[in-house]
């Protein structure tokens, strides 16, 4: 959240002043975050952050050619990760193979077993058979215990949240707040899509948590910071940034 806001601020200053020094800081932030995440390595989070950074650059510069250039860069990075990191290679190969990975197979079985109304709170078995199930496969656990209808309700909360943010942005004249709010909302919604998609075998598992639902102190803190920033932007449409817009 804070890093994305800082990145957006440097982009905003570059657009307003035209000084290349601000673009230098933009590139520096990208390289710094990319290096830290590659050293872990956490390719899923790296792709999430880079897509958010690229989205901000496109929103500020509004250049369709840049969209294709950054898209090509993203695909190249994914190809690099596939041929460099064994765990990325394994997850992608398992996804495109005829059989699902054991974890995803158990997740799908739990979803089917839950039916429309679930087996009841605490009665699900998936959480006992998959490591870190409270993070990566929390969505499947919810469906198993509370049912498909409850899972659909949870899944719909994120696009509804995105729609509400778009409504707020309609009355926001400041470019910095517009783009930063949109990108923060993008992170939350895309991360939710990735988590849910991996639980139902739409995309390869990445280990990403489900915003505001998965267990985890650091991830919950980051969501709280993002949500607090969004609330602050929505309540202060005419703040100090408006003087520079």
Each model region followed by its residue ranges:
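Loop-to-helix entry and N-terminal half of a specific, functionally important transmembrane alpha helix
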Residues: 168-207, 213
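Membrane-interface transmembrane helices that cradle and orient dolichyl/undecaprenyl
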Residues: 7-21
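Interfacial segments of multi-pass membrane proteins
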Residues: 51-66, 126-150, 207-224
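Hydrophobic alpha-helical transmembrane segments
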Residues: 145-165
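Hydrophobic, glycine- and aromatic-enriched re-entrant/interface helices and adjoining loop segments
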Residues: 66-152, 176
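Hydrophobic alpha-helical segments of polytopic membrane proteins
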Residues: 18-39, 43-83
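Hydrophobic core segments of transmembrane alpha-helices in multi-pass, intramembrane catalytic enzymes
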Residues: 1-11, 29, 45-56, 73, ...
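A juxtamembrane structural motif centered on a specific transmembrane helix
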Residues: 195-245
């Amino acid at each position: 959240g804070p890093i994305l806001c800082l990145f957006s601020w440097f982009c905003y200053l570059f657009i307003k002043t035209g000084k290349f020094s601000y673009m230098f800081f933009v590139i520096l932030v990208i390289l710094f975050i990319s290096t830290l995440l590659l050293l872990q390595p956490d390719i899923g989070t790296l792709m999430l952050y880079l897509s958010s950074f690229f989205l901000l650059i496109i929103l500020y510069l509004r250049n369709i050619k840049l969209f294709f250039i950054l898209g090509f860069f993203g695909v190249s990075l994914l190809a690099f990760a596939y041929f460099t990191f064994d765990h990325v290679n394994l997850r992608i190969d398992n996804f495109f193979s005829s059989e699902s990975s054991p974890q995803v197979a158990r997740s799908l079985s739990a979803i089917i077993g839950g039916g429309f109304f679930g087996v009841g709170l605490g009665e699900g078995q998936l959480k006992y058979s998959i490591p870190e199930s409270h993070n990566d496969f929390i969505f499947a656990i919810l469906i198993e215990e509370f049912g498909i209808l409850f899972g659909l309700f949870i899944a719909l909360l994120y696009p509804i949240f995105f729609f509400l943010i778009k409504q707020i942005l309609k009355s926001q004249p400041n470019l910095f707040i517009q783009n930063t709010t949109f990108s923060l909302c993008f992170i939350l919604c895309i991360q939710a899509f990735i988590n849910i998609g991996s639980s139902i075998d739409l995309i390869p598992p990445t280990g990403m948590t489900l915003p505001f639902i998965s267990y985890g102190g650091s991830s919950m803190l980051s969501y709280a910071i993002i949500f607090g920033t969004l609330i602050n932007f929505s309540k202060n449409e005419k703040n100090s940034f408006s003087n520079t817009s």
